[in-house]
Amino acid sequence: ILDYLELPNAGVLEFLFTVAAARGQGVGRALLAEAERLAKADALRTGRALEWIAAEMNDPFVATEVPDNMDPFVRARIWHRWGFGALDCPYVQPALSAEQRPAEGLLLIAKPISAGWSDAVPSLQVRRLVAEYLRWAMRIEDPEANPQYRALADWVDRRATVELTPLARYIGEWG
């Protein structure tokens, strides 16, 4: 599932998965390529070229309460090969319902498409992306009133860009 968000001019991947038997055969890469193609087409309908794609990922270094269906270090290697890096920001997903808690231990990852964004993403774009994602995908009407969003917004507002660390480097496998 991919959403195109016009304000940050970005695609957000909510889900991209393959059954275990199909892994290692290029299915995930093909799904990502099609999602990227669709996001680019959506951006062009607004008169712009797509600037980036973002997603959430379990932080491989943080133990989760629910077992992951894939080794998180393997997942990080795969997404690295697909061109994604970890955004160096304090991202916490707000609770999905009143009965749940906010989800810590996640990385916000990004694949820059815009020239000049290989090492960092403009802070305003990160802020806009998360606000629009919360509004449209999570149905949080006023992201500014959400404590998890406010913490991220306050953090990004103090800098011009958010550093983008290649996922292989993040997991310690590359200089």
Placement of each model-derived feature along the sequence:
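A conserved beta-strand-loop-helix scaffold within acyl/acetyltransferase catalytic domains
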Residues: I1-A22
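Short, well-structured alpha-helical interface segments that form or flank functional binding sites
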Residues: P8-G11, G26, A30, E34, ...
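Generic alpha-helix signal with a bias toward terminal, lower-confidence helices
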Residues: G11, Q25-G28, A39, E65-P67, ...
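Acidic-residue sensor for enzyme active/binding pockets
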Residues: E14, E36, E56
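Conserved acetyl-CoA-binding loop-helix of GNAT-fold acetyltransferases
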Residues: T18, G24-A41
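A short acidic, glycine/proline-enriched capping/turn motif at secondary-structure boundaries
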Residues: A20-R23, P60-V62
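Terminal substrate-recognition subdomain of acyl/acetyltransferases
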Residues: L44-G175
